[in-house]
């Protein structure tokens, strides 16, 4: 009887097994892929669901942006409406480093194609595991417009 009580007490206080580093990295990459899909269907709220609300820090163009809501408002204002305004977003070359059981850093590249305009850049993102979900707490972007290839002169 005492052994049964001790066994039940041990089960009741047992911590869930820690996820493997590979599964944590996969969960982070899944968060980014979910965000990418949301952007590509024009769902900016869905895109922003990957960021910690309200205290995420955004850095872009050498400036701090106005938090979660300010960034959502910016995306809706500058990229909302017609699909050609939001374009197609693709994240690639992503590398995840686990810093602690609840913290990770991702560095990767992205490409945003909006009609003839193509913007590429690098993202550095700090993730924190909050209530079992990986969320971005700091996002730094450096971007540049890709120059279109020169057109060949017409032959006389």
Predicted features and spans:
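Sec-dependent signal peptide recognition
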Residues: 1-7
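Short S/T/G/P-rich N-terminal loop/turn motif that feeds into the first structured element of a domain
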Residues: 10, 18-19, 129-130
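Short, low-complexity N-terminal intrinsically disordered segments enriched in polar/charged residues
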Residues: 14-53, 147-156
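A solvent-exposed, acidic/Ser-Thr-rich amphipathic alpha-helical stretch
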Residues: 26-31, 44-102, 111, 117-118, ...
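Short hydrophobic/aromatic-rich beta-strand segments that constitute the beta-sheet cores
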Residues: 57-58, 105-106, 136
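A short, structured loop/turn motif at beta-sheet edges
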Residues: 96-103, 127-133
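Beta-strand secondary-structure signal
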Residues: 105-109, 124
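Short beta-strand edge/turn micro-motifs at domain boundaries
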Residues: 120-147
